[in-house]
Amino acid sequence: MKFLVWGLGRSGKGALKLLKERGFEVYAGDDSQNPELWREVLGEVDTVVLSPGIPPSHPLWKEALKKEKEVVGELELAYRFFKGKVIAITGTDGKSTTTRLTYLILKKFFDEVFEAGNIGKPFSEVVLENPEGIAVLEVSSFQGKTLKTFRPNIGAFISFSVDHLDWHPSIEDYLKSKYRIFENQTEEDFLILNDLVYEIKKTPSRARKVLFSELYINSDSVFYKDIRLFNPKNLKIRGLHNVYNASVASLIALTLGLKPEDFEEVIYEFRGLPHRLEFLGNFNGVEVYNDSKSTTPHALMHALKTFPDNSVILIVGGKDKGADFYSLRHIVQKKVKIALAIGETKEKIKDSWKDITEVKTCNTLEEAVKLAREVSKLGNVVLFSPACSSFDMFRNYEERGEKFKELVEIWFTRT
């Protein structure tokens, strides 16, 4: 077999190395270095391996399908060489937090546990290091679209809202890409579903289902059926959405034979990932949070629910992915004292909310942070939760979040 790997970021390089080490003949390139190479070699290869960021509208993808070439992603490729257990976690929001917490629990009790996928480390790098063990994978819709034989032993579909319509041709395609992650599961496998969401509830899978509706949550306990999982008061990660994220990690651990008393301390010690409702400090009675990972209105909604009514000075906006900000009117009216809108979506946000709360548009993130400092008062919360991707102003959400932290350091601690 001959392969073409297209896209030479970290996942593409991992796929290339894996194929070469397994003795396959491989062509490789990307749009920035040799954009026409694929046209020269496509006829010679059997399989095209695409990096996650390459959309279905790309001419290589279209031409490969036209020529009846197999099109897969790096995750599917790596899976074909992996011999261990696979845990696959997906959702519009919360999947990184849940993946990391699951990984932290399992690595305490099992040898050879790996975290990979959309969270940062390509699965192919794991397979090169050790093709066995337990792989805890965060799986995006981009990765889901190119899966073929992938079959997780344990799956989790934890949240869904409209997203990535700049990449997927439709909502249906986005959802179908999520479903594909679980479609090869059998009765021997498990699938944890947030069945409180209609689109997730109807996920097609033959796996044994573990459902959110079977969870019971009160002020000091989370139960799955009659099993007490943990005390939500002891969590360091804020918000009801994080109670559910911790519940999913707990349910995965239960499925693998662990008991709550074994792993609850790991849950209580977990402080969350950077840029996810990250507490930056209390500055003269004003709390500041960095939620740069918020790339959807759904994520913003969960963040706002965490704070008292009419307390939030919200910095919001970024690249326009076709998001619906009008749908947030109820929670914005209840929680937001003033919204400071930035990026491509600033006028769209203003038009959606201007009759329910004060909205000011800012040309830069620095302008917004400076204004937030000026208008904030004792008891207020300054929340940076963009509800958009970062690509209009920054390379990624990490760079955006780090810039926000730098600006908070300047305007909140030095003034």
From Swiss-Prot:
Alphabetical list of Pfam families matching this protein: Mur_ligase_C, Mur_ligase_M
Membrane spanning residue stretches: none
GO molecular function: ATP binding; UDP-N-acetylmuramoylalanine-D-glutamate ligase activity
Subcellular location: Cytoplasm
Entry keywords, A to Z: ATP-binding, Cell cycle, Cell division, Cell shape, Cell wall biogenesis/degradation, Cytoplasm, Ligase, Nucleotide-binding, Peptidoglycan synthesis
Keyword ATP-binding included in the entry's annotation: yes
A GO CC annotation given for this chain: cytoplasm
Pathway(s) it belongs to: Cell wall biogenesis; peptidoglycan biosynthesis
N-terminal signal peptide: none
Family designation: Belongs to the MurCDEF family.
UniProt protein name: UDP-N-acetylmuramoylalanine--D-glutamate ligase
Annotated source species: Aquifex aeolicus (strain VF5)
